[in-house]
């Protein structure tokens, strides 16, 4: 009964009243909205061993994807943070400070590569190698070029480079190559530096706001070349942080079905824990109901390694 209730409100994001009606319709057993509201907390309370295991394995992974998304709880704005791979997910809650990022217990001291957006809150993680999400870079470039296509030709050139370089990296991985060729990397770096130089020269003597924005973006690309091109220089690193963005997308779904917010901070924290479990189980091909049934009977399912096999 607990597993089916958790499936309704945790895996399918149903409001508690609708979940109670669904339980009655499918099982013939009437349960209260209070029972449905409390099942997520009961599940979260059993998931300590899982969260410990997930954090341990994530810290062993060579590449992690990180992101954060806003969530309203207890009348205020908070954040759900994620650290994940293709097979593991760990979510936690807090504000947007570096202390809150560290509180997830995965990123502090991590020595692999973190693929992320350009948010400065991750910069203190000095033990890790950093890679910027290519999708974010493309959105920034497209937004600039859209408003001034004649004056921001460099942005189009840079976007074309990133798209082309990603195709080269994808093809190299598919062919089993360990890296791009020196010739390819030289071409990528030369194209990159040329686009940056044009962005600076075309904007530095203009006074319009779009020119200031263009200069700022060109200088950002100049200062973060290694992070932006990490996907090309290290083929184990993905082009985007979409894995992390997909992992936090259910936060928005749950928020919509919860009247726009969580009533308590503990409720939001419980959500993050249970969603970590369900997301990881799904990535391993385990049915959500099976994972929840095991949780409420013999204890949580635990991933055996960083990846299956």
What is each stretch, according to the model?
Residues 1-309:
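Catalytic center-proximal scaffold of phosphoryl-transfer enzymes
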């Amino acid at each position: 009964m607990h597993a089916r209730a958790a499936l309704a409100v945790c895996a399918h994001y149903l409001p508690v009243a609708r979940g109670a009606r669904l339980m009655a319709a499918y099982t013939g057993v009437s349960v209260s909205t209070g029972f449905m509201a409390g099942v997520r907390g009961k599940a979260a309370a059993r998931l300590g061993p899982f969260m410990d295991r997930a954090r341990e394995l994530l810290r062993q992974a060579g590449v992690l994807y990180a992101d954060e998304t806003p969530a309203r709880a207890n009348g205020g704005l908070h954040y759900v943070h994620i650290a994940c791979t293709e097979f593991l997910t760990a979510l936690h809650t807090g504000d947007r400070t570096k202390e809150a990022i560290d509180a997830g217990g995965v990123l502090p001291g991590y020595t692999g590569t973190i693929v992320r957006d350009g948010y400065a809150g991750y910069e203190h993680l000095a033990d890790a190698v950093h890679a910027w999400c290519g999708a974010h870079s493309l959105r920034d470039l497209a937004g600039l070029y859209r408003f001034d296509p004649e004056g921001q030709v460099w942005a189009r050139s840079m976007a074309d480079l990133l798209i082309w370089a990603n195709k080269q990296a994808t093809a190299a991985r598919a062919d089993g190559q360990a890296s791009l060729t020196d010739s390819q990397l030289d071409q990528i770096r030369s194209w990159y530096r040329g686009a940056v130089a044009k962005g600076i020269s075309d904007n530095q003597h203009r006074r319009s706001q779009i020119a200031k924005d263009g200069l700022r973006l060109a200088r950002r690309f100049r200062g973060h070349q290694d992070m932006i091109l990490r996907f090309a220089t290290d083929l184990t690193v993905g082009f985007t942080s979409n894995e992390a963005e997909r992992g936090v997308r259910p936060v928005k779904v749950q928020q919509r079905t919860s009247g726009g917010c969580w009533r308590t901070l503990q409720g939001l924290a419980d959500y993050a824990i249970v969603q970590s479990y369900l997301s990881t189980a799904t990535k391993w091909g385990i049915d959500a109901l099976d994972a929840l049934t095991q949780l409420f009977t013999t204890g949580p399912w635990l991933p055996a390694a960083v990846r299956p096999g």
